[in-house]
Amino acid sequence: SLEYKDGIKDNIEVVVNSGDSDFCSQVNFGVDTVTTEWFSILEMDDEYSKIWFNKVEEYMSHYNDVEVFLPIVLDVSTEGKFLHFTNEPVWAPEFSDKLGFLDNDALINFPNFQTSGGVYKKEAFKSVGGFKSSIKLHFVYELLLRMTYYDKTIMTIPKLGYKKTNMRENSLFFNYYNGVKKVDPLEAKWWFNTAKKECYFKQDRGIMYDSVEQTV
């Protein structure tokens, strides 16, 4: 059973996904069921800051052409210790063509951005095909490359909007690095390069890694 604070319960609808349960498929399923113009992605054990959605609303009123608003993300360990910030480089001079905005060239040179916590226009997300479940490890990078390649406008709001817990036990990326789905460095590099190639295609082409082929 799920319990919510007073005033929140009536605004919560639990939707059961009876299909594929990988991260990308679950997000895509969730987006398909959304009836609002915008949506956001909240991962397990992560937190929005108290000011985040107020800031999004404020920036929406000034930047009508933006289709994705990313937060500055506070990355912490499972013990709650500070690791680093993410999504903030767009506010560094000369990082991208336009201060505060993410573009394709900037992503090619600096891939470390996160999608969780962001607020997305559903139409923009759907128009480029959403997440690709066949892309392992670098599916976030591939999506952002694809969105910027197809000229979707992505802005980082210069406020701390999201706290992300890294490497939670049995989480997807924990398993990629430590668990049953562990990805070795050679495969990780292959998926990174594949993300840069697949971003030109809106559809998920069902890419698969062949370890034998890579060692020949």
Predicted regions and their residues:
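Acidic donor-binding loop at a coil-to-helix junction in glycosyltransferase catalytic cores
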Residues: 136-143
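Catalytic beta-strand/loop signature of glycosyltransferases that borders the donor
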Residues: 72, 155-161
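Acidic donor-binding segment of Leloir-type glycosyltransferases
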Residues: 1-18
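Catalytic core of nucleotide-sugar-dependent glycosyltransferases
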Residues: 149, 159-168, 173-207
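Short, flexible, basic/aromatic active-site loop/helix in glycosyltransferases
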Residues: 88-110
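Conserved donor NDP-sugar-binding/catalytic core segment of glycosyltransferases
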Residues: 51-87
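Glycine-rich, basic loop-to-helix element that forms the pyrophosphate-binding segment
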Residues: 17-34
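Short aromatic/hydrophobic "clamp" motif used to bind/position activated sugar donors
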Residues: 39
